[in-house]
From Swiss-Prot:
Organism lineage string: Eukaryota, Fungi, Dikarya, Ascomycota, Saccharomycotina
Protein name: UPF0508 protein CAGL0M08074g
Homology family: Belongs to the UPF0508 family.
Amino acid sequence: MDIHTLRSRWAYNVQLLKQLQWACTDTAKRSLNGTISNIEASSFANNLQKCTEALQFCIQKSLTIERTLKNYEIDVPLPVIKDVLLEQELMKYYTVILMEGCKLIFDYSISIFRIGTEPRFMLCLIKLYLNLDSITELLGNEGNQFSDLLNSFEYQFMTQYNIINCNTIHLDQVRDIFAKSNPLIAPPLLTVNDIEKRGYFFLSSVDLHIDNKLIEIAQLKNGHLAVFYVNSQRQSFSTNGAKQLLKELVEGRMELLNMGRTLLFQTLKQRDMVIFLEFEDSLELVTNNSLTKKLLIQCVDKVSWCTYWKIYLENLFSEEQARTNVKASTSMLNPSHSFQNFKIKHTKLSELRPVSHQGIALNIPQKKSQNCQANITKSDDLEEDPGFKFAIHQSNPINEIYTSQTEELITSPSLNEIEYLSYDKLIALDRSLELTLSPKLLESPREANYKTVSQTFSLDRINNISQNTPEVSDQESIVSNDELEKEPVFNPSVEDHKPQLLRKKSSLLSIFSNKNKSKNKNNLKLEINSQMSSSNLSLNSASSSRTFFSVNSNDSTSTTVSDKYIEDSDRFQLDNTTSILQLKVTKASCWDKSSWQVLSSFPLLLSLVKDHEAVYLTLQNPSNSGRFKFVTRISNIWKTTRSTAKDIQISIPTKDILATILDDLTNTTPRYQVLSLRTEEAERLKNTIDHCINGDMLSSISNSTTTRTLSSDASSSYMSQVSSNVSRSSTEVSDLNVHDFKSMASVKNILVLSDIKARLHTKNNGRWCPHHIGLVNIYSLETPNNKKGIRFELTTDTRTTFQFNSKIHDLKRLGRTGIAMIDDSEYLFEFPNNVITEQIYRYIAPSHPMI
């Protein structure tokens, strides 16, 4: 054993342990400053604490071993190796460092240990593994304990890497392959659980600018096909390839950390594409439209290609309706496959068909054409179809003599006969029942039977509000002082009038309006005569602040919601939350037993926010974000439907509703409640809520990564003042090289956002050209009385720093993911996705429109 080599390796081992300790300490400090939003997760914090304590012990123990090795000049005795180098407690803490460090690197919720151009923690951990491996070789047979530990680490690292790499799906780059310019589109709701079978292929396409890239084709459970781009451009490593992976990472192959798959375009179903050319180990597909974009798919594994994938692709995209030469077995096509399901069902139905008949054996009643005449003179027509034994009714009244003659022939059909009637016969049946069975049918209509827009009704039968009639300002009001007719049938009288259209805002609430007072849309109130008895109109004291104004009468059916807010709204002020979506809802209502209850008379601000525990939906006053109308937690059992073009309805479990101004929603027994939302961005809202339900949300900036909060006051400056409990870094800047900033004596440089991944572009001959990728810090350039500009500070992977200053009015939103500085020299920062870009833009320039 070379004692000098052992000393140098052990000294290097101590150095690596100190670097790991520094990385853990730095991460803990950044978590306290709010840089890592998910650090509060108990599992992550526990793993970090274990790793830090183990590193502290191993550093102290390794320093002692290093001093012990200096006492030997030629060789180390075997007892010293067993008692010092292979001490049981030391091996235990090395196991904690390697295993807990592996968990930190591949944690689903935290990516700080595996992202970046040089992930320090991961590289130091791998170097520690390689150094221990070299020490094990020096120890020979005595180092078996180290060998077992290193083998366990290799297996753990390889397993976690493959799990993350194969089960992470990115849906932020889905393009429309059937469009000319291949624009970005909304991704389908796709998870790993929807994949039935997957395999590696090479994809080439001139139209999509793809040249022999490694992809993964997945057969979904619904029979569709999904094409994923392999981000690392490497197939999954086997267990024996763990050492190769670790060595490549140490050598700088950081593209291996770009894990996961990215969906290239929408899922393909039958006949979306057609086989253009067929080769031994590949197929060339072409889109089934006028653009005819071509995709060349080449296999990686010829065995699976010949036995499965070639047959699957031919059945999905072949122009032939049936293939007789190649037949897929049941084991090769999943029973959930749409083609196989149809074949099985069609075979069962074909067995029921008689030999002398064609088609599917379904008993469908035949419709016989009949001529509808004004007067029916023959009763033989009624006997042509036994299921149609009634006369056809027209609007002209039928003579009583004829009715008495045919009454014996008219019989009510049974329920079984009604099920097989055609549409025309059902209409005729409905008319005949109205003619013969209605007890209040009038022989000839009167003028009073026709309802018109300006018709007046009487409400004298409502005793407790008939004493004092409110003043009415609406000329189209439905209130009238006419006495009711004494007949039991409600046949209101009508005055001579000119018909006119009903105004959009007319409603039953107009009877409470005041002619002499202007309408206030933001604070609707019920104007009631002061002489009215207090027993007729009262507040429900048991409902506290979440109550309605209601008329205490059994005959009254009108109920309106006053502009109330949740009393204890302060408990919903979540500081460490991330904003997912904010938009205006013009109308929000909840179903209350038998009617819709409107939550507010003015538009509300809908917000989707998340923290480390859950995602929340809130409805609040847009001018005061602290006043809530509705707060609920989003769970995976929510259901959303699109009722109209601008309306969506959400089925919410009662247990998920945290607070609302409607008492009946939280105190009733139904398990589900229905919330209806009307907005101009209904499609965007439904898609975002569906992603929240399924847990598929784009990454965004949490509030903890910023030093400011977004102001809700539209009249305020482009950023609100920093709250007293938030700390921010500030440095004095005396000379700024941007426009008129030079003339300012004192400009403060205030950090707003930090460490945001971005790509810098510059404009060259009218085109944006990418230059650098790195992390951006955004600063606010402020004077004591005003905000003047924004500074972008970009730090690249080569540790080079660039600074760009811009006036506020020169910042423009460009496209989905860009923010441009349009001044003398134009620059563009491109951010990871639309959500992050929108949040950054609203922090630094919320008052400017998008371009």
